[in-house]
Amino acid sequence: MLSAPPTVIIDVEASGFGRGSYPIEVGVALADGRTACFLIRPQSDWTHWDPTAAALHGISRDLLAAKGRDVREVAASLNELLAGSTAYTDAWGMDSSWVALLFERAGLPQRFRLDAVARLLNDEQKAVWADCKSLVRAEMCLSRHRASADALVIQQALERTGELRRTARRGSPLSAASPESP
C-alpha cells in the first residue's frame, strides 16, 4: 500500500508565552521534503522577552536584530510557500495567534490555513506521539530547538505514527519497519 504524502508542518518560536509575546522565527517542512526558516526582526513595540523561552530556543535579541527579516517579507514568503494549503502545527493555540499577529503587522492576508496536528491523529497515534517525537529527534541528531528543525521532527513523527494506520501491529510501531520471522 502506498503511504500518504507528507503533511505540511509549521512551527513558531516566540519571545515567550502569553500576553505580549510575538513570533521570532517561523519554520516549515514542506510536503516535497524542503524546509524553510525565517528569523523575524521584532517590531519596535515588541518588547516582551522571556529568558526561559530564550534559553529553550537559543535565539538572542542581537541575532534577531542582525539577521531577522521584516514581518512583511516573512509573511509574503510564507504565503508564497504555503498558498492554498493547510499547514499543521502541534501547538495550534499558540502558533495560530503568533502567525495571525505576524500577518496583521505585515498588513497582508494569510493565504493558507493552520490546523492542529492532533486532528490528524487517532487514539493509538496520540498514545505514542510524545515518545515518537523524541525518538525521531534523536535519530535525526537534532539537539537544537529551532522552528525548521521542530517542523521536520513533527512531520517525520506524523509519518512514523501514520504507520499505525497502514500496517499490522508487528513489533514496535516506532521502530524501523522490518519483517518478523514467522
Regions found by a protein language model. Give the residues of each.
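Metal-dependent phosphoesterase core characteristic of DEDDh/y 3'-5' exonuclease domains
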Residues: 4-6, 19-24, 30-59, 79-182
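Short His-Asn-centered micro-motif
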Residues: 10-12, 67-68, 89-92
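Metal-dependent phosphoesterase signature
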Residues: 55-77
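Short acidic, Gly/Ser-rich segments with clustered Asp/Glu that frequently serve as metal-coordination loops
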Residues: 12-20
